[in-house]
Amino acid sequence: MSAGRITAKKLALAGMLTAVAAALSVLERFLPLQAVVPLPGVKLGLANVVTMFALFFLDFRLSAAIVLARCLLGALLGGGPTGLMFSLTGSMLALLVMAALKRGHGRAFSLFGISVAGAAAHNLGQVLVAMALLNDAAVLAYLPALLAAGLITGVLTAAAALPFFGKFSKTGVAGK
């Protein structure tokens, strides 16, 4: 079996993870987070639990496909084209950063460090989209507040993911 081959098990897992990520994205829209954190655009990043999970138990290609499908489904289910630009840019940048840091997992970066860096990358991606849409660099002034929120949400996301990592790695479902 070649290393790049996608098995039926992995494809089925990717499909399930896509459904879970899309459901979490939609669910997150209904959480009244703005009542607790009065910063526009701040979300918990629940779907990033799935992204990290896919990175660790599948591969980069399938993880990217899951992120792309989640963003497209989110746009179709109410996010619209502007929401797609924000979501896709932030999510893909987060995926790239987390994939790069995953190589140092256990040595240089913990799951928490990878998650926080992913949250920061996601926020940076969204600010870059806002700058492009508004044609105004003043949007960068919002980045420190988003990065502070990303620190908190990144830690929460990693804490939510951690119990699943240990249990799932013992099943052998992903072939690792």
Go through the PLM ranges and name each one.
Residues S2-F53:
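Hydrophobic transmembrane alpha-helices
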Residues I6-L17, L44, N48, S63, ...:
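Residue-level signature of transmembrane alpha-helical entry/exit and packing/kink sites
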Residues A14-M16, A23, I66, S87-A121:
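Short helix-perturbing small/polar motifs within transmembrane alpha-helices
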Residues A21-V26, M52, A75, S91, ...:
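Transmembrane alpha-helical segments of multi-pass membrane transport proteins and ion-pumping complexes
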Residues S25-L44, A69-M98, L111, L134-A138, ...:
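Interfacial aromatic-anchored transmembrane helix boundaries in multi-pass membrane proteins
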Residues P38-P40, G80, L84-M85, G104-K176:
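Membrane-embedded alpha-helical hairpins and interfacial helices in multi-pass inner-membrane proteins
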Residues L44-F60, V97-K102:
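Generic transmembrane alpha-helix motif of multi-pass integral membrane proteins
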Residues L58-L68:
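Transmembrane-helix signature of polytopic, membrane-embedded enzymes
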